[in-house]
Amino acid sequence: MSDLFDEPDDATPLEPEERDGLLQSWVTTRADLNEAEQASIDKGAAWARRRRGRDMLSEDFVRLLHKRMFGEVWAWAGSYRRTGRNIGVGACRIPAEVAQLLDDVRYWVEHDTYDPDETAVRLHHRLVAIHPFPNGNGRHARMMADLLVQQLGRPPFAWGGADLTDIGEKRRRYINALQSADRHDMAPLLTFARSA
């Protein structure tokens, strides 16, 4: 894809006002955007790794991680979306849904409701389902899951060993696994998360 705002069929397109939030004037193609976002994500990941051991199950951390991951590229990074989407909860419900999710995860951890992998994958799935940000929700949710599973003593996930922003078989498997989780079957997403 060369057009800057072309999206894969299964991705969430940006609204015109969200597109205006692009901070990098050198970004003119989809490849440029992917490169800029990946560089910003890498810096966000390094920042998050330095914070190991600190509480990540807060709404402030959810937003700050997104800002650290995408803040060099998008002015709205770290801000919840204000528009409707074909996926996710209504924009007005995002803060309450994120707070409920974080409460649920704290409960799961405290009471050993699920093993560490399943706890982190459930966090990932629910964050994607809420879809709190204009863009970057899958990448952000995968980072949150990796951070949580590491806090729980397990290695980070491989997520199919591929760049899931690229259209291809791995992305299709990931989307299918998310759809299975939507139907309360977590096994495909757990398997995919640990696959290389």
Q: What is the predicted function of each stretch?
A:
Residues 1-196:
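FIC/Doc superfamily catalytic core
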